[in-house]
Amino acid sequence: MNYPNGKPYRKNSAIDGGKKTAAFSNIEYGGRGMSLEKDIEHSNAFYLKSDIAVIHKKPTPVQIVNVNYPKRSKAVINEAYFRTPSTTDYNGVYQGYYIDFEAKETKNKTSFPLNNIHDHQVEHMKNAYQQKGIVFLMIRFKTLDEVYLLPYSKFEIFWKRYKDNIKKSITVDEIRKNGYHIPYQYQPRLDYLKAVDKLILDESEDRV
């Protein structure tokens, strides 16, 4: 049997129960090849669909410089620039808790540099934490393929050290000791709320 274009029909072995296609045989449970932002996006979609949590990425603020109005009913933006975010990347609600966090990736194998965290972001994290929010930094070491949740209560110690010009980064060992490892799995790939559960339990004891 041929298709209308003359090409012969071939059975789909995956549908017929034969050899699996590459899409199913090469499933990877690690995070290689996918950005941290994409992993979080997939996890948040899973949480929302499963009625577990409502967490979203905040839109990057844009400063519009030049707008053209070819018609009264239309506006064309000719020039615009992304502005430096004034807060963190993500926020939402999980089991009655306000969640607020910043997500960062680094290719560095031994430490996480602090020069790409901004003062106003840390100030926002501090304010949210003081209101009993669950605030943290999510860090992925790309080369090591490891992801950690570093609570704000621990992060602020390293941030003060950085601002005092003592050390410009947080070592991997310091993050492993003070943070929570988030292992990759199947669904969702990055189930970071399991680490959040541990953080909530620990901080509920610390804040009593």
UniProtKB/Swiss-Prot annotation:
CDD domains: RecU-like
Main location: cytoplasm
GO cellular component: cytoplasm
Superkingdom per UniProt: Bacteria
Gene3D superfamilies per UniProt: 3.40.1350.10
The protein's enzyme class: hydrolase
Classification of source organism: Bacteria, Bacillati, Bacillota, Bacilli, Bacillales
A UniProt-annotated Pfam family: RecU
Keywords in alphabetical order: Cytoplasm, DNA damage, DNA recombination, DNA repair, Endonuclease, Hydrolase, Magnesium, Metal-binding, Nuclease
Cofactor stoichiometry and binding remark: Binds 1 Mg(2+) ion per subunit.
Function: Endonuclease that resolves Holliday junction intermediates in genetic recombination. Cleaves mobile four-strand junctions by introducing symmetrical nicks in paired strands. Promotes annealing of linear ssDNA with homologous dsDNA. Required for DNA repair, homologous recombination and chromosome segregation.
GO biological process: chromosome segregation; DNA recombination; DNA repair
Gene assigned in the entry: recU
Name of this protein: Holliday junction resolvase RecU
E.C. code: 3.1.21.10
Marked site positions, Transition state stabilizer: K104
Swiss-Prot/TrEMBL cofactor(s): Mg(2+)
Coiled-coil regions listed: none
